[in-house]
Regions:
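Short, contiguous alpha-helical
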Residues: 7-22, 26-71, 112-165
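Helix-adjacent hinge/juxtasegments
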Residues: 64-104
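Carboxylate-rich helix-loop segments that flank metal/cofactor sites and access channels
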Residues: 101-113
């Protein structure tokens, strides 16, 4: 994978997150926090997990190993979640714009929140981050339908089509 391909994926990720957040803006607080049969309990919980995972992988990429995820309290409201996820996406963008091919092929050592040490190739960590976020955006889209809201599509091909004249 080239640095330009990485940047394309992270531009896409920020675009898709913004579309996801736009889909949430019509929700009232009750529907945002309503318990649903889902991995993370609610739209808020799933969004908090998505953002916290992006943050912890960014920290690992930077050479840090936080021992816990961001608290869900940072995502108490849609406005708080919007600000925090946008901030994380800006930090991710700043990080990936400085990468070259040698960086992408290098390894990062880190320790998980469970205390397990790992070492991965940087580009694999970046791909995991993108894949993980896509997976949970899909979950949020499904949860939005459960609370009678309409999610915006966040497919990569839609982003790529929007770039073409």
């Amino acid at each position: 994978m080239t640095p330009e391909e990485v940047r394309t994926l992270f531009k896409y990720n920020a675009w898709a997150n913004e579309r996801l957040l736009s889909s949430l803006r019509s929700l009232d607080p009750e529907r945002f926090a309503r318990y649903l049969k889902a991995s993370h309990g609610s739209i808020r919980g799933t969004l908090a997990h998505l953002a916290a995972a992006e943050w912890i992988w960014l920290e690992r990429l930077r050479g840090h190993s936080p021992d816990q995820l961001l608290p869900e309290a940072e995502f108490e409201t849609i406005e708080m979640a919007t600000r925090r996820l946008a901030e994380i996406d800006r930090e991710l963008w700043d990080y990936v714009t400085g990468l070259n091919e040698t960086d992408l092929e290098g390894r990062r050592d880190y320790v998980t929140t469970e205390g397990k040490p790992y070492s991965n190739v940087l580009q694999d960590m970046l791909l995991h981050l993108i894949n993980h976020s896509s997976y949970h955006r899909g979950q949020v889209a499904s949860l939005l339908r459960q609370v009678e809201a309409t999610p915006l599509a966040t497919d990569l091909i839609l982003y790529l089509r929007a770039l073409s004249p």
